[in-house]
Amino acid sequence: MFLEDMVEYQRDRVTFGVFQKLVVKLYKALVFNLSNKKEKLEWQLLLIADCLRIIGLCRLAYRMASKVHTSTSSVKNKFWSTHVSGMVLQYSGDMIGAEKAFLKSQEFACELSLSFSLQHLGKLNVEVGNYKLAEQQFIEALAIREKLKRADLVESTNRAIRGLQKLRT
């Protein structure tokens, strides 16, 4: 997939803010690396990988997330590295690989993280036209988010459900 196609495909947009965030995360990664704060460094690397995904540097983003996954001992970073890998694969058009990564991430998920995995699986299933499964995944994510009283995330999931309903009409 060419860079222009990838950028068109993404819901996230390349803006100055993305580059600004990337520079800040690179700086923080350097600071955490120099101060031997491994888990914080890994987290910054995942945020950097997400910025790289948005910019369209998906191979680099995938390698970075995979490297964190293989080197971390943090369950949280295992989840997020696998989840970021799934997002990168989805945004580069590898829906099968993305689905596998999102499902794999659930092995490392706490309840809240599981809701992110379910919501992203739902988005993936909307994109491939599997609306019934997408709706089930959105409803599961919504139930978790309501139970945890995460109003900001509940709204995000409700927006996804409304978008799916709009597609069906």
What function would you assign to each model-found segment?
Residues 29-33, 52, 65, 69-72, ...:
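Eukaryotic all-alpha helical interaction scaffolds
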Residues 40, 77, 113, 153-156:
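Structural signature of alpha-solenoid helical repeat junctions
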